[in-house]
Amino acid sequence: MPHRAASPAMSENEFDITGALFQNDSDSDNEQPSAKSKRQPPKKVPSQALDFLGDVNEDDDDDEAFIAEQQTSANRKASNLKGRTVKKGGGFQAMGLSANLLKAIARKGFSVPTPIQRKTIPVIMDDQDVVGMARTGSGKTAAFVIPMIEKLKSHSTKVGARGLILSPSRELALQTLKVVKELGRGTDLKSVLLVGGDSLEEQFAMMAGNPDIVIATPGRFLHLKVEMNLDLSSIRYVVFDEADRLFEMGFAAQLTEILHGLPANRQTLLFSATLPKSLVEFARAGLQEPTLVRLDTESKISPDLQNAFFSVKSSEKEGALLYILQEVIKMPTGPTEVSQQRKEEDASAKNWKNKKRKRAEMEKAVNMRESPTKHSTIVFAATKHHVDYLYSLLSEAGFAVSYVYGSLDQTARKIQVQNFRTGMTNILVVTDVAARGIDIPILANVINYDFPSQPKIFIHRVGRTARAGRKGWSYSLVRDADAPYLLDLQLFLGRRLVVGREFGDQVNFAEDVVTGSLPRDGLSQSCEWVTKVLDDNADLAAQRTVAAKGEKLYMRTRNSASLESAKRSKQVVSSDNWTSIHPLFQDETSNLEAEREKMLARIGGYRPPETIFEVNNRRMGKHENVDALDTIKRVRTTLESKKKRAQANEKSEFLEDASDDEKAANEAGENENEGAFSDEDDDVPTGVADNMSMASDSELEVTFSSYSQSKENKAKKASAASFQNPEYFMSYTPNNNSLVEDRAYGVHSGTNSNFAQASRSATMDLAGDDGGRGFGEARTLMRWDKRHKKYVARQNDEDGSKGTRLVRGESGAKIAASFRSGRFDAWKRGNRLGRLPRVGEAEAPNLTAGLNAAISGKRFRHRKEQAPKRADPLRGDYEKMKKKAELAKERAMSKAGGAAPRGKSELKNTDDIRIARKLKQKRREKNARPSRKK
């Protein structure tokens, strides 16, 4: 019987697959292929679904790859989305995403992809490794979540997680989980959150339930990997969110062990707002021919963000903070509108007779809509001691405050952040734990109470506001000691430095670095109030003392500013404009008020030329304190000699610099290839400005070269430029790369950011054959711990163990011995579980219950029903309890359909009958046994 002709009907997605079913365009079995024609396998297309654990069959793989490619092309058609307006030129519809994912994206509120999403999503869909950098608030989370959901598609019944997202902080991981759930609607993908502070037993149950996506922090994920002996060979999609923070020294031990267990054929993605151009610092990530996408390298921060920097003294920081909150932001005191509304609802619920159970109130609190107020402000402090102190101080001032720091309990952290998100509080005081990735809608202001020591920390802090096209403000308190860091930030951003009112009205807070002081009257009133509160409140004064001690340790361990900025900051701080009124208050103060402020500032900075001993000696004419006078004279003589030598050195250096600059300018003018820097920005030094030229995205040079800002090297480069042929000359330093920017973006910042300095400190220790000491300088293995008053091992400082016992992991790196505590084995015994399924095997249905309960949030709901207690006639509320018991009985009767409680069924099944027959037979044999008595 001949085969019927091919059906002309199109397939469901409007494309015909008969071309793949029949070779040589034959539509039926009647046509015989020619003898010369050979069977050509279809062109293999990279699979869009990460299901590599299936049966290995080449023909099936080819068919699946072809169908996946056709499905992707069909998804790109505008006709696939009926009744929707399709934007031309690179919308989400043109990326080949499925209909369910497009609906979730539209439900999320995304209409047009952001630049980072438009650049990275197609590359990720082509199974390439990506290193992506874009400014804060540009949609980097959706840039890697959308292709992950498209690749995973649906839940796999085979054991093994396929996606892994690592985040440096718990709040960022929680936020990523929320985005994954919102974009994963319409799919049955299962995702879990593994962060520190949560119950290990619950996380054991979730991991045993075979999740598809794991969102975790490195420490807790490594703990579960070692404790449960997890096999990570099934993971095909790895994301390092905020990669520059993850690859710093704090996470070195965790990442080494985690990366060792990941398969080599995985797809690796690195995302952050501050990534260096040199990828050598991420060599441990195992990138394979990555695509580097660096956007917004010139802007770095949002153009909608306006910045203000206030010069204050150390004793005025608390008063300055209160003045900014009260007068600049206009922060209201007392409870917020949301909290008042909540109290009214609670009061009405108490008056309601048939009020619901507390569980319903808890659900209502959890499901509250995130609606921060227009006054929502984040205050960044240096240490957790500062956070506690500022929380108490601002609460004393009447503000609604929340606080978060690293060592806070995880449940408390969730509650505090949720209160701020829902508008229960207006102020969130945090350390840098919340500086990365936290996306709080309608956040209006950011205050840097302690100025950051690195420019990239400043970028992440102020990036919490002015997100997704909204406006925002950042206010920073700058002391005299913080001025070098301010100049480093100004050079990094490449913006003009405006000190005081030197430029008059021509100030742009979004494009300039504008500094100045706060109005003296309001600042002095706030400082007086703080002093009064500290005198009246002993607990607050004790917290301030602890914060001062913590600040000493923080100042000792923070990174140092550049030498050029330190020299330049002395001139900036000593100028009169440093203490002048900030241009932000130009409308409020007249010129006469500005002169008054200058006079008060000069009086405040007055230093008497004589000491009290010299003044008394000159007035009284007596020589009572001869020893003190002699000591002061010797000190004064020494200081004067040092000052003269310093002035002479500065004069000689100035003359040398002027001559070197003149020579370099003359020789550089002869060379046409050397580009001259624009003179529009007088605040940026010429040498630094030459190094701040932006590089193109396609360049991927990896450089270890060190750069010196000394005048001698500049003169040598300028003199050598005469014989350099630009067509053949290859410099050992990059010409177009901004070294200032790369140093600020560096992962190992501080002293180890320079390769030359790091190479000097690198040593190779060889032990002698006889075990004796060598001739070289022996390295001290112990150091003195000032806090604990004892010697501790230096190795503990390097690996972060701080004296805890260490064991060797699979990669050879040292990990904490507490990771192998045996709690997982105890959990299995407690739940009566035997051997768990391995990677590649089918999942066990009884193990998925824990994961499903965790996803639905029903872990803590009890189902037990008990009869109410009998009312006690001797109690005063006897009638009330009696009515309550009667209502409970009526509710139980109505629940059972009005009938009496059903008894146990007496019908026997086959097993019961079989067991009963066996017992009856045993009794019969026992009764028929003859008696032993004779």
Swiss-Prot record:
The keyword rRNA processing applies. Residues 916-934 have a biased composition (Basic residues). InterPro entries: DBP10_C, DDX54/DBP10_DEAD-box_helicase, DEAD/DEAH_box_helicase_dom, DEAD_box_RNA_helicase, Helicase_ATP-bd, Helicase_C-like, P-loop_NTPase, RNA-helicase_DEAD-box_CS. Residues 669-684 have a biased composition (Acidic residues). It is found in: Nucleus, Nucleolus. A motif (Q motif) lies at residues 90-118. Keywords: ATP-binding, Helicase, Hydrolase, Nucleotide-binding, Nucleus, Ribosome biogenesis, RNA-binding, rRNA processing. It holds the Pfam family DEAD. Residues 1-57, 334-358, 639-688, 854-934 are annotated as: Disordered. It is an enzyme of class 3 (hydrolase). A motif (DEAD box) lies at residues 241-244. Residues 639-654, 865-893, 903-915 have a biased composition (Basic and acidic residues). ATP binds at residues 134-141. Residues 121-293 form the Helicase ATP-binding domain. Residues 361-515 form the Helicase C-terminal domain. CDD domains: DEADc_DDX54, SF2_C_DEAD. GO terms for molecular function: ATP binding; ATP hydrolysis activity; RNA binding; RNA helicase activity. Residues 21-35 have a biased composition (Polar residues). Its EC number is 3.6.4.13. One of its GO terms (cellular component) is cytosol. PROSITE patterns: DEAD_ATP_HELICASE, HELICASE_ATP_BIND_1, HELICASE_CTER, Q_MOTIF. It catalyses: ATP + H2O = ADP + phosphate + H(+). Belongs to the DEAD box helicase family. DDX54/DBP10 subfamily. ATP-binding RNA helicase involved in the biogenesis of 60S ribosomal subunits and is required for the normal formation of 25S and 5.8S rRNAs. The Q motif is unique to and characteristic of the DEAD box family of RNA helicases and controls ATP binding and hydrolysis. This is ATP-dependent RNA helicase dbp10. The lineage of its organism: Eukaryota, Fungi, Dikarya, Ascomycota, Pezizomycotina.
